Amino acid sequence: MKPNAETDNKVVFEEYATLVKEKYATLEFKGVDINHLADSIGNTITQDMPADMLFNKLAIITNRFRDGHSPLIGVYASGNFENIATFDLYAGYPVGFNDTILQNSYTGASIAPNLKRIAIDDQGTSVEVLYGFLPQSATIAYIRIPSFNVTIEDSQLESIFTKIKNATACILDVRGNGGGAPSLSTKIASYFMSQTTYTGFERFKIGPGANDFQDGPSNVTPANSDNRFTQPVVVLTDRGCYSATTTLCYNMNPLTQVTFMGQRTGGGSGSVANGWQWSLSTSEFIDHLGNHLDDGINPDIQVIFDNTDQNQDEVLDEALLYLQ
């Protein structure tokens, strides 16, 4: 998209830099000196600079966030996307799981008759929530939730936890779950709690100043159910665990019976004068130990998935072995 005729390139750049300075919540944690960065880039902005070059200049700031929630989007006049600058969650990290291997060797209907399946729509794509028992163990329960961008009814949650309540342990597999509704992920976490749990606090950016923040403590109440599961749990994570999935991990992290295994998890909108759209994270999570979660949560036990072995999921196998 070409900037509006009356819009100066420097005005667009300075507007975006000011929005970041006044609204973005984690500049200090990310080590971004927005004033220095804006000054150094701003000196290279010219009025005759093409739109794509100007976009790339703004994207330098965007990419410094290391934040998949805060993209910059350039659009055509028709409204179609032209350029998107956002953080690549997977850059520098190995693959965390392979869905084909998972289905062929562990969860497929033909080999896992003791796994129940709930087909749910995820924005036009059908996904399956799995729960029950894998063929590898009749006593260790397995729950697979590939997305929180879905609706799981309370009655369905009760069915899941009724099915597994007599298991000796549980594997909760959320690898590749890019998030969705934090209310759903929090509700699922509450099924693993025996008492109200302080999980940390959310820090909200409430003003333009560098220190204009307000903290909101987070306490999660156990699910009102007779089927809560308080036996040992392993949560399988990878870099694709983002947004509401990190919220799930954040809420389960204080629970002493929970172990995280696999890889590190992944962690207000409007537009600038020429129509490019922005999104900026206006809050950050800090866990019960004071750790910032925007860069993700490290597993208790790191396990690297070997994508060259088409018959084995090393992460899932390690979880089964750990819980035996």
Q: Model-found features: residue ranges?
A:
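BRCT (BRCA1 C-terminal) domain core and associated BRCT-interaction motifs
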Residues: M261-P299
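Flexible, low-complexity junctional segments that flank or bridge functional domains
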Residues: M1-C170, V174-S190, S194-R203, P232, ...
